[in-house]
Amino acid sequence: MKDRLIGFIKTYCLFVCIFVLQKPLFMLFYKSLYPDASCADWFSVIWHGLPLDLSLAGYLTAIPGFLFITSVWTLSKSLYRIWCSYFLFISVLISIIFTVDLGLYEYWGFRLDATPLFYFFSSPKDAVASVSIWMVLGGIVAMAVYAVVLYAVFYGILLQKKLLLRMKLPYRRLKVSGILLLMTGLLFIPIRGGFTVSTMNVGKVYFSAEQRLNHAAINPAFSLMESLAKQKDFSKQYRFMEAAEADRLFKDMLEPAVAGGQTEKTDSVQQSADSLHTLFNTQRPDVLFVILESFSSRLMTALGGEPNIAIHLDSLSKEGVLFTNFYANSFRTDRGLVAILSGYPAQPTTSIMKYPRKTQSIPAIAGSLRKAGYGTKYYYGGDADFTNMRSYLMSSGFEDIVSDQDFPVTERLSKWGAHDHLVFNRLLEDLKTEAAEGTAEEKTPYFRVLQTSSSHEPFEVPFRRLENDRLNAFAYTDSCAGDFVRLGSLSRTYRQFVGRTLPDTSVDGGRCHPRAEAH
């Protein structure tokens, strides 16, 4: 049994080591992209990319795990041939994926996914038309060499007959089989990515505001596998009219000057920014977005909703500007966030946040404000890796993300992580610290986003004002927002602060209302 357990562990660790070594190889191959990368950057790429490596190694070790179980009952030559064939196939597969990824990244700007396969199978001739014959031959040679090297490593460490012959048929076969089955089952933990609400996804490795470092941390084989699992034909879902008809209708909605390609501005408001009305007393205010989980107009008396629920927001609506024609963009947080922060409409059957290759290209308010000199930070008490949220936030321009891992374990008591009052308190303490560290003249304006999570199933909150658990959870989040504004108003920087509260989605107590009522 000892030899089988050691062989199982060696197999898993060997896969992990191969994937880890691919990261510095990628960075060396594209050394022109990383001329100023420090040693810390190199180690950060390896460290943050490790979750995907551990997950993929788990997938690839599952079959050897069952082969080890089979070896408890038979040590036939057929089993040895199956063993060798599996690792030969894996060697070729890893070699093809890694080599193709190296070759295409220069042109595509993202790590390998299903896109090249789509183009190749749609039209193989056109797919390779822009590639010289020497590049194709060079790629094939590189694949072959890498596959041979990988198989030699597998053979030398795992497949030598003398190593396999050391294994004997055990006396307690059921016991040994049970232990090996348990070990194989434990691979589910790295495959899934732990026990949090989020499962393993490419976005989990995003850690830097520099996309080149995030891309280097991605495991291309995992990226390809995830992309194939999510492959959809979007053209069949959303192609409602011919392109010419769509262009004609869109052109009619544009201003004449824009539609005609003119550059001079004819409107008096367009000519001078000074003519625009403003509600601010400073040109570069600090900006805070508070994104309220599942809130709707039905919770606010000011918007015609039920009384005595969101009493603090009702009060604030009389002091600030109330938008009465603001509508929820979707019914899921991952879709609503992209609509709020990037102005990207939600799709009915999918979420763009789950496609890091797409989200890295869409504009976002965080990126625009960062270019304007703002410091950007995102606060969320839950798991920032849920539905690829981390990759979207880092790509969109947020320099730092505060999530559940930044709170003590004793404060992560809800299903979704830290309760809302703890997240608001963390934000308030950070703002006080930043205000104390610099003078008003040298202070960098900030853009902060706080996303709540307590007003979500199972609606368990450390607060009791209403009998209904669901409504009480909304009242709790409302009280957290009210306390934050009350305490924040005591700060000396409050006059330079612009706050905006809005919901991510609209969930209205299970009742269905016309879309026009889903504020």
Show which residues each predicted segment covers.
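Alpha-helical transmembrane segments and their helix-start/interface "positive-inside/aromatic belt" motifs
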Residues: K2-L14, S78-V92, R173-V176
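Hydrophobic membrane-insertion alpha-helices, especially the h-region
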Residues: C17, V176-P190
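Membrane-interfacial interhelical loops
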Residues: Q22-L52, W83-M143, Q160-M167, R192-F222
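Hydrophobic cores of alpha-helical transmembrane segments in multi-pass inner/ER membrane proteins
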Residues: S55-F68, I140-G156
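Cytosolic-side transmembrane helix boundary signature
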Residues: T74, V145-I179
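Membrane-interface segments at or immediately adjacent to transmembrane helices
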Residues: Y119, S123-A129, T184-V269, D274
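Solvent-exposed soluble domains appended to multi-pass membrane proteins
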Residues: E255-H519
